[in-house]
Structures are given as C-alpha cells and as structure tokens.
C-alpha cells in the first residue's frame, strides 16, 4: 500500500496527464482530505509496524523517526519536484527536501510567482522533518547519557538486585526477578551489550543498564555504595551471575567476591551471590571451595539441571512413597539423584517435638548400560554429606539397542515396581523418541517424565495421561526466580516455625506457607541463616566452617546458642526498623484484646518484640534460642560443619630431652603409643613424657644446656571435639572433653588441658 501511494504521488509530478481526473483532483489545491489520508496510510503502507511486536523500548525509538522521515521525504518531493525549473530535475528537489531536516526551506512562492503560498504538503513535510530530527536528537542524547543517568540512580542509597551477563536464554530469570522483587529495590544489569534485545527488555522493566566490559569499577558501582567517609557498604541483596559460558560465570563470580571482600554489610541485611554453573561436578567443586570460608555474604551455584531435577522429583511422587526409576546417565540423572539424597536428609531431621521420624525410603532403580557408573557418581557426589543416604538398585542393560535401554528392559523393572515413577533422563535424541509415550500408554498408573529436546520447562500438568514432557529451566515453580539452597533452608526454618507456633484464630501473613509468604518475611528467614553463618566467629562461639565433616560433630552448647540468639535478635530488629517497623507493646490477655490485634499491628508495622535483648524477657529469649538452634541444625544440609576455630599459640617452657636407643611404648590417657629408635624422649617439669619424631624435635626445640631444651616456634590449636580421632606419627588418639588439637607443619596431635595451659601461650 505504501509503495502504491508513493507511485501515485510520483506520477502526479512526472506525468500528471496520465492520472485519472478523479485521482488528480485529490492531489492538488492543498486539500486537507487527501493529505490526511496519505499521512495515515503511509506509515502502515511502508510496513514499519508490521505487527512484529510491541511498540516499546528501542523498537519505538527507531520506528517513529523513520516514519516521520519517510513522510517528510515523500511530501517534500511532491512539493518541490514541480518547481525544479532550470535546476536539476531530481537532485535539486531532493537537496531542498533534505534541507528541511536542518530547518531550511527553499521558497518558490510569492513575488508574482505561480504559487501564492506554501503548499500544505510542504508545511507538513517541514513539520515531519523537524520532528524526526528532534526525536532522533533526543534519542541519541538519552542513549549517550543512559550510563550517566544509571550512575545517578546508583548513587541513591537503595537496595538492589544485580544481574550479570544477560542473554536471550536467561530472559525468563529477568522477568521473574522483576515481577517478584520488592517495589523499593533497584534492578541493575551488567552486560557487554552483545544481546541488544535482552537489554531492551531489561530497560522496559526499568533496570539500570551498565554496558561495556564487566570490570572492577562497574562491579563496585552495581554492588556497593561508597560513603563520603570512604567506607564501602554492600547494597546488593541478590547477585545473579548468568553468563551462558560456565567459565565466564566463574570468572565474573570471582571478580565479584574480590569486590565484596573488605566491604561492610549493614546490620539486618544479607547479600546472596548466585552463580550459574550448569555442570553439576563443577558446581559441587565451587561449593566445596567455599564450605570452609566465613564471609559477609552467602554464595551458591545455580544450574538448570538442578532446578529441573527438583521439580522432576516433586512430580515423581518419591517423597510420598513412590519408587523412582532413573533411565540413562546424564547431568540431569545425577542431579535427580542429588535431589533424592537431599530430600532424604531433610526427612531425617527431628520434628518440632524433637522426635526423629522413622525412615521410609523408597527404592531408587538405575537403568542403563552405565547404571553402575551413575551409582558411583552419586556416591562420590554426596561424600561431603557423609554419603548419599540410600543404596540404589542397579539394572545394567546392553548397549546394543538404541539408547542402551529397550522397552523390554523397562517392562522387567516395572513388573517388580508397578507403581514406580520413570524418569527418562537420557540426553535428548538418544534412544527411542516415543519411549515416554509408549510407557505412559502401557502403564497408566506410572508417572513418566521424559526429557525431550523440543520441550520447554517443566509443566505443571501432564501432556497426556501421566506423561510429562520436560525441558531444562532455570526458574522455580510458578515462574518464580531460581532458588538457591539458602532459600530452601529458609523454607525449612519457616516450616519449623509454623509447626512449633500454632496458627492463631486470625492467621497472620507470617504464618502463610512459603509459596504465599510475602517477600519481606522470606528475606528475613534468609537473613537469619546468613547472620548465623557469619557469626560463628564471635568470641562467645569461636568456631569456623570445616569442609569434610569431622569424626564427631561438636554439639552447640547453651551458651553458644544464647550468644547467637542475641546476635540474631539484634539483626532482626535492624531488618525490621530499616523497613519502617517500630516497637509497640503487645496487648495482654487481661485486656481481652480482639482476636485480630496482631494482624492490625502488622498492617501498622508495629512489633511487640522490637526492643533490646534485655527488654525482650526470658520467655522470648528462650524461644529465639529454640529457632536459632533449629536453624543451626539445618546448615549441615548444605555440607557445612561448624568446628572450633584454630588460633596461633607460642610454645613456652623448658624440657629435658634424650635420644631413644630402643623402641619405647608409652600411653596417653590409656591409649597406647610407640616411640621408635632415634626418636626423642621429652619430659616436662611435671614429669610427664612422650616421644617426638626427630624432624619435629629439630623444628620445635632449641638446646640451652645438657639435656635441657627450650620450646620454640608456634603452633595452631583449637578445642577438641570429644570422640574425634587424630592421627599422629605416634598413632591414633581419641580426643576427650577439654583436650586441644594442635597442628604444625602438617602434623597433628592431641594435648591435655593442663599440659596445654603450661606449655603454650596465645600469640600476640
């Protein structure tokens, strides 16, 4: 249509006699009607909108200047071509038309000419040209200044959610975050700008875009706030690193950790760093590296395989007692087994009444040519947690058939497990593509989950019967953002709170199930875990996080729990106060308050417990301790073991030492040990003796007289965990209450409390 309109206008100029009288009458005498029709038809005729998407963002910025420029060119040429005269018949009118965009007009009317006034088409062309110029100038200015405008918004002291590395396959995460984030939070996107469509959508959500190479300066702008006094404060509550290339994501995460190191976190807030690492083995290595560090922020890996596996296990009904059959060896299969192991650990947690539930684990059957290898993978993968917690049934099949598993193989398995859920976790494209549909038709009582190449996400309802066709998805159920393991632990803590604190007659928002719990309360639960994670180093607790679990877990003492409960309460108060809450005394039962008085308090942002720890009173202090102890019991679910912290001590005192000329047996607290020929026999002032290897003796004793040696050097020591076994060159030693574990140059040993007190001094 647009080309037809342009053709008619061109014929009117070049060969007006060829146009029918009816059409030519519409093109002259400055009639408004035809020109309005032309203006309305031309944009549509040119095909610019084309129904190809919403007219927002960068598309709109390109569309309307183009439409206005096309209108100006057509109407300008219509006005100038008949007036070319002695000038070049085409180039002169074209030059005059282009000059309209700069505000210049070639006058050919008046002074006795044939035309008494400017044609209406020319006036409209001038208006369209100037509008296009202005529109383009404003757009260029906004593009050039967008980075500066973004920096100005980042200067505001606001909490923010940061996304690093945006692409088309992670747009679902952006949409979910933008939909669920707190209204007072700021969304910040750091990206190199290669995917302009993704950045345009981020802009449509109001995100601050920091384009260009992702370096230390931009990371600091996005994640930190620098006060005038020079201190750096972490302002990012969540940081998603979503680079599609795994190594890029890991490198960016390390840069972020370096940026956050040394920055402070305001009381009551927590920062979570979530890194997209799709390979389960690399993700586990990432977590293990950070299982021994005490940081001001929480970190975890995100994976499309893990997020999908959680939903697959939920669909399978395994938690409800249904056996699980896993077919194939893949990243998804390994992630499914990891989720089964996690749910087993959760099921073994003590209930609210303190009773550990009986184990009712269902059968897990692995089917495929590499089923035994998958079982070994699962065992290795769960070593950080003390094992998988279940022994799978391995059904090794022949690799001769396509995909390694035939329908007959699965028929044999389902004969023994007729109610099992079958997860076809083979890589898409391997094996019979109709296996899922055949199983669903042959075994209508079985849930069948099939990983297929053309499927997207995990549907809530089956495709047909009990068949679910799934694809990988980073998002959680309901299109919510991906959940890290800290959020899952926070949900368990919330479930315990709901179980131990009966729901009042008029339920409050804080008693809602996790999926309906307001974000404010969800983040408070995560805050609690983050506070406890980073507070184990306070002097009253003096612990740190160990990687592999110790022989025995050191129970939390009442004094440690009380100290952590006080720290958690102070963090809770800071969190609530920063969100506008204030203290208001509760309504005692003697006043016969209305049943919904706590609901009314919540609406007014009043909290009776928003006061100092001392003012809280013994009863609330006790219950805070109960919730804190439960949260501490949850941390081992992520492989974290809190062991006493090591400190550096100086060796002091003088001993008598002689060289052994023959082996000598000796004992420490009833445990037999042995010194070999050539070892040193050391006796302290109290008369106690023990053997020392020559290399250790040379490094830790200095001769000061005949058979007299001064203890020198430093060691690292910590409180012993009762029952743990320490292996030294002299043999194995079982630690007791009050003992100390010492280590130096890779050698560890146990010292009694009295001997340690007399022979070591805390290094200054």
Where are these regions (language model features)?
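Surface-exposed intrinsically disordered loops and tails
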Residues: 548, 582-616
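Cytosolic regulatory regions of ion transport systems
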Residues: 1-71, 82-92, 99, 106-566, ...
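Short loop/beta submotifs within extracellular cysteine-rich repeat domains
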Residues: 521, 536, 572-576, 580-581, ...
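Ordered core of a single globular domain
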Residues: 616-623, 628
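A motif-centric signal for short, conserved binding hotspots located
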Residues: 645-685, 694-747, 754-756, 762-764
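Structured core of small recognition/catalytic domains
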Residues: 378-396, 741-764
């Amino acid at each position: 249509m647009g080309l037809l309109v342009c053709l008619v206008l061109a014929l009117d100029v070049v060969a007006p006699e060829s146009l029918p009288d009816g059409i030519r009458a519409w093109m002259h005498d400055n009639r408004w009607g035809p020109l309005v029709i032309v203006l309305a038809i031309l944009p549509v005729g040119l095909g610019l909108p084309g129904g190809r998407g919403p007219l927002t963002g960068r598309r709109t910025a390109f569309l309307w200047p183009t439409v206005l420029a096309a209108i100006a060119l057509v109407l300008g040429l219509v006005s100038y071509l008949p007036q070319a005269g002695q000038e070049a018949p085409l180039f002169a009118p074209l030059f005059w038309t282009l000059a309209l965009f700069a505000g210049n007009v070639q006058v050919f009317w008046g002074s006795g000419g044939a035309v008494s006034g400017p044609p209406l088409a020319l006036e409209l062309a001038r208006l369209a040209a100037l509008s296009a110029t202005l529109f383009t100038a404003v757009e260029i200015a906004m593009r050039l200044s967008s980075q500066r405008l973004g920096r100005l918004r980042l200067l505001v002291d606001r909490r923010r959610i940061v996304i690093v590395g945006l692409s088309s396959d992670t747009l679902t995460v952006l949409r979910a975050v933008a939909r669920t984030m707190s209204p007072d939070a700021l969304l910040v996107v750091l990206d190199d700008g290669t995917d302009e469509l993704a950045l345009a959508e981020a802009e449509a959500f109001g995100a601050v875009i920091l384009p260009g190479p992702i370096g230390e300066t931009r990371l600091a702008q996005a994640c930190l706030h620098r006060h005038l006094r020079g201190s750096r404060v972490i302002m990012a509550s969540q940081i998603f690193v979503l680079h599609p290339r795994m190594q890029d994501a890991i490198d960016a995460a390390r840069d972020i950790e370096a940026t956050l190191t040394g920055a402070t976190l305001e009381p009551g807030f927590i920062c979570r760093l979530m890194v997209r690492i799709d390979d389960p083995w690399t993700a586990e290595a990432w977590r293990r590296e950070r299982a021994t560090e005490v940081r001001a922020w929480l970190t975890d890996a995100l994976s499309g395989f893990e997020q999908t596996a959680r939903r697959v296990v939920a669909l399978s009904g395994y938690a409800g007692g249904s056996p699980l059959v896993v077919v194939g060896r893949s990243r998804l299969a390994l992630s499914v087994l990891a989720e089964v192991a996690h749910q087993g650990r959760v099921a073994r947690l003590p209930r609210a009444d303190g009773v550990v539930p009986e184990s009712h684990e269902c059968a897990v059957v692995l089917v495929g040519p590499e089923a035994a290898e998958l079982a070994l993978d699962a065992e290795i993968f769960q070593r950080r947690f003390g094992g998988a917690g279940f022994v799978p049934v391995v059904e090794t099949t022949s690799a001769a058939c396509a995909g390694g598993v035939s329908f007959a193989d699965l028929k044999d398995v389902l004969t023994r497990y007729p109610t099992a859920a079958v997860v076809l976790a083979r890589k898409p494209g391997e094996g019979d593509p109709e296996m899922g549909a055949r199983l669903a038709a042959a075994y209508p009582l079985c849930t069948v989950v099939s990983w297929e190449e053309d499927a997207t996400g995990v549907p809530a309802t089956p495709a047909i019967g009990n068949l679910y066709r799934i694809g990988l998805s980073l998002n959680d159920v309901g299109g919510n953002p991906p959940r890290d393991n800290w959020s899952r632990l926070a949900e368990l803590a919330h479930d315990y709170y709901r179980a131990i604190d009966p729901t009042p007659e008029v339920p409050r928002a804080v008693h809602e199930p996790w999926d309906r719990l307001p974000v404010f309360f969800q983040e408070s639960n995560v805050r609690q875990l983050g506070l406890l994670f980073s507070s184990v180093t306070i002097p009253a607790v003096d612990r740190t996080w160990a990687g592999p679990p110790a022989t025995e877990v050191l129970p939390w003492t009442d004094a440690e729990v009380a100290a952590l409960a006080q720290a958690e309460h102070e963090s809770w108060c800071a969190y609530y106060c920063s969100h506008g809450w204030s203290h208001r005394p509760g309504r005692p039962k003697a006043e016969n308050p209305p049943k919904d008085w706590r609901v009314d308090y919540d609406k007014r942002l009043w909290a009776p417990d928003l006061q100092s720890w001392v003012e809280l009173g013994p009863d609330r202090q006790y219950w805070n301790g109960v919730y804190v102890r439960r949260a501490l019991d949850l941390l081992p679910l992520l492989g974290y073991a809190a062991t006493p912290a090591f400190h550096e001590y100086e060796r002091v005192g003088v001993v008598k030492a002689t060289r052994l000329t023959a082996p000598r047996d000796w004992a420490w607290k009833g445990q037999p040990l042995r010194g070999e020929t050539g070892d040193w026999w050391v006796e302290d002032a109290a008369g106690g003796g023990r053997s020392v290897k020559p290399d250790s003796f040379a490094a830790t004793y200095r001769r000061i007289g005949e058979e007299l040696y001064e203890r020198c050097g430093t060691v690292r020591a910590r409180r012993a965990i009762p029952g743990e076994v320490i292996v030294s060159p002299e043999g194995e030693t079982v630690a007791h209450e009050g003992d100390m574990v010492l280590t130096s140059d890779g050698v560890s040993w146990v010292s009694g409390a009295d001997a340690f007190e007399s022979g070591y001094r805390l290094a200054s």
